[in-house]
Amino acid sequence: MSPSDGRRSWPCQLGPSATIDAARAPSRTPDWCIDASEVIEHLGLVPHPEGGWYRETWRDLPADGGRGVGTAIYFLLEDGQRSHWHRVDAAEAWHHYAGGRLELAIAEDDHHQVLTLGDALSSDCEPQAVVPPRAWQAARALDGWVLVGCTVSPAFDFSGFELAPPEWAPAAWEQPGW
């Protein structure tokens, strides 16, 4: 991001006067040199009720005042942090942006799966995944912090969000650690 967009530069572990913008030019600075707290501050993220950090970046506002066609957020999980089991009443696409890998658990009726999101060029990862409407989902960071985007359609509304009780898991869920 350029300084003209109103956002401040943020430091990395490359030195006291270095900024991410400067450090990444001309080659990309590895994500491991950036601390999660720096990403949280830079992107203006706030705590999410399901765990993790987020900020809404886009919301369709229809002229008739009804529910928009979509919303988008940044969502960050710190090392060891989870997004607890929850579901929403709309389809949700997860997109990997930076950091380590993310494990996304999805439970819909009798179909259960765990997907790994990460570097798009990695053979064991996908760059994105879609959770169907009303399917239970949970996520966890695998390798340090992870930054993803979540796009919900139709637009996310907290009235359509259900957070499961702590330690709850979907019926017949057989994956350990969830």
Language-model segments: which ranges?
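Serine residues within intrinsically disordered or low-complexity segments
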Residues: 2-4, 9, 17, 27
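Short, intrinsically disordered, low-complexity terminal segments
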Residues: 15, 19-22
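Non-catalytic, conserved peripheral segments adjacent to functional cores
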Residues: 28-130, 138-139, 143-146, 151-178
